[in-house]
C-alpha cells in the first residue's frame, strides 16, 4: 500500500488509499483469535498464525505480513501494536481472507516520549513466559530476514528527519536524535 504525507487542517498526516474495497471488511486479530480454539503449546505469535490460517488465510502470507509489521514497528519504534491494529481482510462475498497491510503506526518515532534514546521498550502484542515483552523480543520472532533489504533504507533516517522538520514542532536536537536512533535501528 503506497503511503504519502498530506496536511489535514493544521496537522501533517500519513495517508493512503482505502485498504478495503466496498465488499471487504477488516477482521482484527482479536476477533480472529476469539473465533478459534486455543492450541496448547503454541506461543502467542504462533497462536496468531494458527488462528489466521484456521480462518482460511494463506499461512505463508500471514507469516510474511507479521514479519513485516514486526520489523516496521521496531524500525519506527512503534509502541502501540495490539490485537486491534493488525488482522485479516475478508471478502464478504467469497469469504476469502488475506492479511491486512500495515496500519496504525501513529505511536511511533518517540511520540509522547521525552527522551529519544536507544533503550529497549515495552512492546506488544506477543507475550512470552520468559519476561516482560519488549521490542527486541518481538524482533526475535521475525522468521525470514532474507526478505528484507535494510541497506535500501540508508537514506530513510534523513527523509524522516526532513519530513518531521516540515511540521516545525521539533527542536533540531530532537530531530538529530531521532535520525541517529533510526540509523542505529537499521
Question: Which residues are covered by each model-predicted region?
Answer:
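Conserved ATP-binding subdomain of kinase catalytic cores across diverse folds
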Residues: 1-36
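Generic structural signal of hydrophobic/aromatic residues within well-ordered alpha-helices
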Residues: 29, 48-52, 62-66, 160-164, ...
Amino acid at each position: 500500500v503506497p503511503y504519502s504525507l498530506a496536511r489535514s487542517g493544521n496537522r501533517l498526516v500519513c495517508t493512503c488509499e482505502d485498504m478495503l474495497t466496498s465488499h471487504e471488511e477488516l477482521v482484527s486479530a482479536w476477533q480472529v483469535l476469539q473465533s478459534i480454539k486455543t492450541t496448547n503449546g503454541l506461543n502467542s505469535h504462533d497462536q496468531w498464525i494458527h488462528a489466521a490460517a484456521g480462518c482460511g488465510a494463506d499461512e505463508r502470507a500471514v507469516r510474511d505480513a507479521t514479519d513485516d509489521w514486526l520489523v516496521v514497528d521496531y524500525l519506527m519504534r512503534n509502541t502501540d501494536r495490539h490485537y486491534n491494529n493488525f488482522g485479516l481482510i475478508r471478502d464478504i462475498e467469497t469469504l476469502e481472507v488475506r492479511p491486512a497491510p500495515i496500519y496504525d503506526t501513529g505511536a511511533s518515532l518517540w511520540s509522547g516520549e521525552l527522551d529519544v534514546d536507544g533503550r529497549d521498550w515495552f512492546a506488544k502484542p506477543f507475550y512470552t513466559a520468559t519476561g516482560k515483552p519488549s521490542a527486541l523480543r518481538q524482533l526475535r520472532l521475525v522468521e525470514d530476514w532474507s526478505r528484507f533489504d535494510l541497506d535500501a533504507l540508508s537514506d530513510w533516517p534523513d527523509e524522516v528527519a526532513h519530513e518531521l522538520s516540515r511540521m516545525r514542532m521539533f527542536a533540531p536536537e530532537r530531530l538529530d536524535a531521532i535520525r541517529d536512533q533510526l540509523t542505529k535501528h537499521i
